[in-house]
């Protein structure tokens, strides 16, 4: 009986050891991998090497320039060398991680018969009408006509002319270094019509040191897929003024043609409103000498905040909102004039705020007070008002007057208020700005994901990152080839995809789940099971060691 009991006890011990080993094996070989897999943070692979390479991206902006030489514009020996191509390239000195080079590829050729006929006319406008084929010119390309040194096409004191389309005229020269001298003039004209250091600096204003560029460079709106424009009439004294404005007709006549030309750069929506009893919030100063009131330049920033609370919130808008306010001062503060920094009245009686909009003060003619009872009817001169608002709108979009070379005649804008090469120059700037924004966004996202390991990277986020990187590379390649339209479209796609990835809500799912909270959750679950298994394994290990140390047999 004792032997049977000992055998049963040994069998139970062996069974216990096997059970402990089985539980330990299941926990280690199956439980731990399953727990690790089900609790890991999913992170889809990203092109980190491609993103880091974007910091050293070289943007080569190529402007195709066709140079057409008429008879007697250069010496005969030089005319026999035509056609040929000359490339002028220079680096833009900006303190920015992305290198930018402007490349003017000048294709020289002789003028065709119809071009010779057009350029022999009496005025440059007649020649432009005869040469007008803007639909055949690609976006971003330029055509420069070189005429005879003694041609009457331009005024005698003018050496060059910049037209409203993608064309310019430059006087030739009978000189042995004619090509070199004329080539420098052509580059100056081409830069004024396309890419200058100021244009690119304004586009990269948010990415450059603040002390390098003035506030004027930060005036243009940031690139966006759309913009909202609101025209507001502020009538603080409706008891004295019955103001009428034909804003709908003025928008259709003046603003809409301008926005139609700008539609390639974004979508636009326009609305209007009338606000009564809306005050500026700043007390104007009375001038006894002129019996008028004035707003000093230093007080203008304080005008916007009180008025902005009445305009409606723009926080709900997906796009930037531009406000254009027409303020009719109350009778007690009429007439009201805006002063510049020297204390002189501003000619337009208006001012604008960068990336916000503009305000114009519209004074009522004092003669109507004598002939009418209050409230007097006020008919707003919308032509004068829209001239001011359109000028402000151009500045807010970064469409400023170009820095033309000396003795250069600049044509006025067309009826739409925008020249074709100005639109191209805007697209150049927007493309560079979009690429800089997309590169910064992707780099910041890669750094963030590298520092915080428990951020989830879903497949759709990774696909947006890949799409953004590919779009940046595509846009850079298109810019180097001079394909402005496709480059701008690719740059917009790069910004959209990069920001969609950066602001994806799924990135925040496990962001606030640190390691100490993980231990606080998992220890109560696994400790009661792990302690008995570990103790059993220790006991089995100790008994196994004892069994290996058998006592030596003594005779």
UniProtKB/Swiss-Prot annotation:
Q: Where do the record's glycosylation annotations fall on this chain?
A: 267, 370
Intervals, Lumenal compartment:
40-517
Tell me the superkingdom of the source.
Eukaryota
Amino-acid positions noted as binding a cardiolipin in the UniProt annotation, renumbered to this chain: 15, 18
User: Where is it mainly found?
Assistant: endoplasmic reticulum
Pathway per the UniProt entry: Glycolipid biosynthesis; glycosylphosphatidylinositol-anchor biosynthesis
**What UniProt keywords apply to this chain's record, in alphabetical order?**
Endoplasmic reticulum, Glycoprotein, GPI-anchor biosynthesis, Membrane, Transmembrane, Transmembrane helix
Q: Does the keyword Glycoprotein apply?
A: yes
State where the protein is found: Endoplasmic reticulum membrane
Q: Which InterPro entries match?
A: PtdIno-glycan_biosynth_class_S (IPR019540)
Provide the topology term for how it sits in the membrane.
Multi-pass membrane protein
GO annotations of cellular component type: GPI-anchor transamidase complex
Q: Does the keyword Cytoplasm apply?
A: no
Give the record's GO biological process terms: attachment of GPI anchor to protein; GPI anchor biosynthetic process
Record topological domains on the Cytoplasmic side: 2-18, 533-555
Q: Where are the transmembrane segments?
A: 19-39, 518-532
Outline the subunit composition: Heteropentamer. Part of the GPI-anchor transamidase complex, consisting of PIGK, PIGT, PIGS, PIGU and GAA1.
- State the family named in the UniProt similarity comment for this chain: Belongs to the PIGS family.
Biological role stated in the UniProt entry: Component of the glycosylphosphatidylinositol-anchor (GPI-anchor) transamidase (GPI-T) complex that catalyzes the formation of the linkage between a proprotein and a GPI-anchor and participates in GPI anchored protein biosynthesis.
What is this protein identified as? Answer: GPI-anchor transamidase component PIGS
User: What species is given as this protein's source?
Assistant: Mus musculus (Mouse)
Gene encoding the protein: Pigs
